Amino acid sequence: MVMAFPNKEQLEDSLRGLVNEFGLLIEGIKITKAGAKSAIRIAVDTADPRAERPDLDQLEELSREVSKHLDDAEAAGEMSFGAGYTLELTTPGVDFPLVEQRHWVRNIGRLVRLAGGVERIAQVEGEDVVLITPDKKQPSVRRVRFADVAGAVVEVEFSQAPAAEADLVGLAIDAYGLPGAEDQQDSPAED
C-alpha cells in the first residue's frame, strides 16, 4: 500500500515525543507540497515562556533527530514523502499569533496589534491580560481575557517604550486597580 504524504496531525503525533525530549513544544507545522520541492516547516518553542528560546545549536541538533526520525518512519513504511522534501525547524517569528497564555507571558512589555489598534502587554495572570493603551500624556490600562484578544500579533518596536508605559509593565495584577476581566465590557479602552 502506498502511503500519502503525511498531514500536520500525523507529523505532530509522530514528532511530539521527540520534540518534548528536547524540552520543547511544537507550536505549528506548515506543509507545502510541491513534488521534489515539498517542504515541512516546524516551529518549536520552550514550554516555559520565561525561558530562553532554543538557540541555533539546539535547533540544529533537533533538526538532525527529526530528519532521522522521519527517514526511519519512511523506511518502515509508516510515512511517505514522495520525491523528497526540505525540512526547516524554527522558532515562532514576530508574526506568530498570540493564542496560548504562554505566548502572552513571553511577550510581556511588548506592543501587540489587536483588532482595535496597538497596545502593550503589561501583565498576564491566569486567563487575564492587562493591556496598556499608549497615550503620550497618560496611558490607560484595561484587563481582558486573553482568549478575547487571541490572535494578536507582536508589533516590531525600534525604540524604548515610553517611561509612562514602561512603569506599568510587570506590576502585580492587583496593583492596576482593575476589576476582573469578566466584570468589564469587551470594548477597548477609550482614547
UniProtKB/Swiss-Prot annotation:
Q: Which UniProt keywords apply?
A: Cytoplasm, Ribosome biogenesis
Give the UniProt subcellular location, in the record's own words.
Cytoplasm
Instruction: Tell me which Gene Ontology terms the entry assigns under biological process.
Output: ribosomal small subunit assembly; translation
Please give the Pfam families that the UniProt record associates with this protein.
RimP_N
Gene Ontology cellular-component terms listed: cytosol
Assign the protein's first listed, main location to one coarse class.
cytoplasm
* InterPro entries named among the record's database cross-references: Ribosome_maturation_RimP, RimP_N, RimP_N_sf
Record's HAMAP family? RimP
| Family to which the UniProt record says this protein belongs | Belongs to the RimP family.
User: What does this protein's UniProt record list under function?
Assistant: Required for maturation of 30S ribosomal subunits.
What this protein is called in its record is: Ribosome maturation factor RimP
The root-end lineage is: Bacteria, Bacillati, Actinomycetota, Actinomycetes, Mycobacteriales
Encoding gene, per UniProt annotation? rimP
